[in-house]
A protein has these predicted regions:
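Dual-mode signal for accessory low-complexity, basic/Gly-rich regions
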Residues: 110, 266-464
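Active-site bordering "gate/hinge" segments
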Residues: 1-306, 321-322, 347, 403, ...
Length: 464
């Protein structure tokens, strides 16, 4: 038997049978991808891949506590299972007691499709999309612009089984589309991205029309110095900032005084008001169009995850409600340390509570300000304030009297997303969006455009 023919549920059952540890968690991730790439108004490559990753988590009880060992391998066959299990057990025996040790999760009903074959994607996912893309190539060519980009679709079937009796399964589709339009001399560039589950809700013609309009705006070039400007952040930029904020919202780190969510004098800022706008930042594994695993899948332990929590059911969670900080990410272990509720990370993020205004309507209501396309190369400067730095990219536009006057130079920015929430004066209509910076790791987001009266453009950037 090979990794291509072994049934995943049989693999995880056989792995559990081989275990000699006091506890065992097995995670099989069956993944398949299909992709298209293009450049200069022509397809360049396409392909389909398939693979498997098997993770074994062994737990060993001792006088001083329970230790854990984690080993992951790709393309594992039935004949290689025992060596994988022994390696995880050896890692557990060689480790000290796990700080986050807890009893393995029990009492979660078995997934009814646990023994079914894994879901798989194929090039058929592009059946309607590819011809529409070809038509966009023709329009772009006639309009004197070049289209570059890629479309990627992934399906991951996760099988999670434990010695405590859990048998869980989740199928996760994930699609991304990134389209970049350039002028023939490459001096003007515009970007648009979309997140999708099946490529049935993306329209390359509409995206190309949007990019053509932006390239037209860029025909007039305006140089501006660094400074603080009223700025309209589109949903993709808001997503990039708030995803990083979520990744920095571990309850334990905050309680220990190490993050922006630490309260001066001790404790956390849970209960404090972060924004005067009635904004709610939330996650929900059952959010329509942004569905994600309804249980914890942890391949390793860290500040915001614990391998002992694998299989723990996930529920809709409000991180910020009506502008007030309500929850930080907490495992069972960190919840016990901080006295906060158990609120594990969830694989999507939604910000709502703004008006029904579109970004275009917000532009029309701007006397003078900047309109961004997206952010890039975001890095943390100071965890205590969550100060981030990064670059604007693929189009920054000056808005005057409700209309785009032209394209300005790019900037480096220095801002904290927490501070931005506090200074924001308007949020518009929430819509699904693709974060540009974090799209390799996090794609399921819905955000509104946000108006900030004094966004800090700290220096001029020479990037396009």
């Amino acid at each position: 038997m090979t990794a291509r023919t072994d049934k995943p549920h049989e693999i995880v059952e056989r792995t559990l049978e081989l275990s000699r540890a006091d506890g065992c968690v097995v995670i099989a991730d069956e993944h398949s991808t299909a992709n298209l790439r293009w450049a200069g108004n022509a397809l360049t490559t396409n392909g389909v891949t398939r693979g498997r990753t098997l993770t074994v988590i062994a737990t060993v009880d001792g006088k001083e506590g329970t230790a854990s060992g984690v080993v992951s391998r790709s393309a594992v066959t039935a004949g290689e299972l025992e060596s994988l299990v022994r390696a995880a057990e050896a890692a557990a025996h060689g480790a000290g007691p796990a700080e986050d040790a807890n009893p393995l999760v029990t009492g979660v009903p078995e997934s009814p499709d646990f023994t079914d074959a894994p879901a798989e994607t194929s090039s058929a996912v592009f059946t309607d999309f590819a011809p529409a893309l070809g038509e966009s190539f023709a329009r772009a060519r006639a309009g004197g612009r070049e289209l570059y980009g890629f479309a990627n679709h992934e399906l991951v079937s996760t099988y999670l089984a434990t010695s405590a009796g859990l048998r869980l399964r989740h199928d996760q589709p994930n699609g991304t589309l990134e389209l970049n339009a350039k002028s023939p001399d490459r001096t003007r560039s515009a970007w648009a991205g979309r997140s999708t589950r099946d490529f049935k809700d993306v329209d390359p013609a509409a995206m190309d029309a949007e990019l053509a309009r932006r390239l037209g705006w860029a025909e007039r070039r305006i140089e501006l110095p660094a400074g603080r400007y009223e700025t309209l952040l589109p949903p993709t930029a808001v997503a990039d900032l708030l995803i990083y904020q979520m990744w920095s919202a571990a309850a334990r780190d905050a309680a220990e005084g190490r993050t922006v969510f630490s309260r001066t004098g001790g404790g956390t800022r849970v209960g404090e008001r972060l924004s005067e706008l009635p904004l709610t930042l939330r996650s929900d594994p059952h959010e329509p169009g942004l569905e994600t695993a309804p249980f914890v899948v942890a391949h390793a332990s860290g500040d915001d995850a614990s391998v002992f929590d694998n299989g723990l059911p996930l529920e809709a969670t409000e991180w910020i409600r009506g502008g007030e900080l309500k929850h930080l990410t907490a495992t069972r272990h960190s919840a016990g340390l901080t006295g906060l509720p158990v609120t594990p990370s969830i694989g999507n993020l939604i910000l709502d509570g703004g008006s029904d205004r579109s970004l275009e309507e917000m532009v029309a209501n701007t006397e003078r300000g900047l309109l961004l396309t997206c952010l890039w190369y975001i890095r943390e400067v100071d965890p205590a304030t969550l100060l981030l730095t990064g670059l604007t990219r693929d189009g920054v536009y000056l808005v005057e009297n409700g209309e785009v006057a032209g394209e300005v130079n790019n900037f480096r920015f220095n801002e904290s997303p927490v501070d931005l929430l506090g200074r924001a004066t308007e949020a518009g209509r929430t819509e699904k969006t693709l974060p540009r910076e974090w799209s390799d790791w996090f794609t399921r987001a819905a955000m509104p455009p946000v108006r900030v009266p004094d966004f800090n453009m700290s220096s001029v950037s020479q990037g396009v």
